[in-house]
Design a protein with these regions (language model features):
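Chalcogenol-based redox active-site neighborhoods
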Residues: 1-175
């Protein structure tokens, strides 16, 4: 499935590969690689509420800021897991985390086969990088929040994602 013009980069329309997920959808599986080159699937990410922050490349200003922001938020949200996904090589992700003391988010790379991007609808066909997006996945592996940022160079709505994650964590905790 391709979604022509679903995103733009500096105003230029681009095609996203994969479905457009919405709240209520089952979170699709994926196969990503951690910075130790080990495969990681959805099941491996645990049963906590997860914020999945998707960025094109850590070496760009907005991606850098987005990942640092979620690293700061992770310190205040001990019962949540925050994952950053990009097409950067695991070695580059590890270097970037070390350079900027980012140690509270789990970095995962989709460079190997792009399965995350294809399954979550974030793979930019023309560039073979991820688009900017945020997903919140609850303990039952249901998507409770999905934001595809229309202009790749723009920031996502951090507060909306954080509110959805807090709500999912407290709703489940009170059952």
């Amino acid at each position: 499935m391709e979604r022509a013009g679903a995103t733009t980069l500096k105003g230029n329309p681009l095609t996203l590969v994969g479905p457009e997920l919405k709240a209520g959808d089952a979170a699709p599986d994926f196969s990503l690689v951690d910075n130790g080159l080990k495969p990681v699937t959805l099941k491996d990410t645990g049963t906590q509420v997860r914020i999945i922050s998707v960025v094109p490349s850590l070496d760009t200003p907005v991606c850098d800021a987005q990942t640092k922001r979620f690293n700061e938020e992770a310190a205040k949200l001990p019962d949540l897991s925050i994952i950053t996904v990009s097409m950067d090589l695991p070695f580059a992700q590890k270097r970037w985390c070390n350079d900027f003391q980012v140690d509270k988010v789990k970095m995962l790379s989709d460079h190997k086969d792009g399965s995350f991007g294809a399954n979550y609808g974030t793979l930019i066909k023309e560039l073979r990088i991820e688009s900017r997006a945020i997903f919140v996945v609850d303990r039952d592996n249901k998507v409770v929040h999905a934001e595809y940022v229309k202009e790749v160079a723009d920031h996502p709505n951090y507060e909306s994602a954080l509110a959805a994650a807090r709500s999912a964590a407290s709703a489940k905790a009170s059952e």
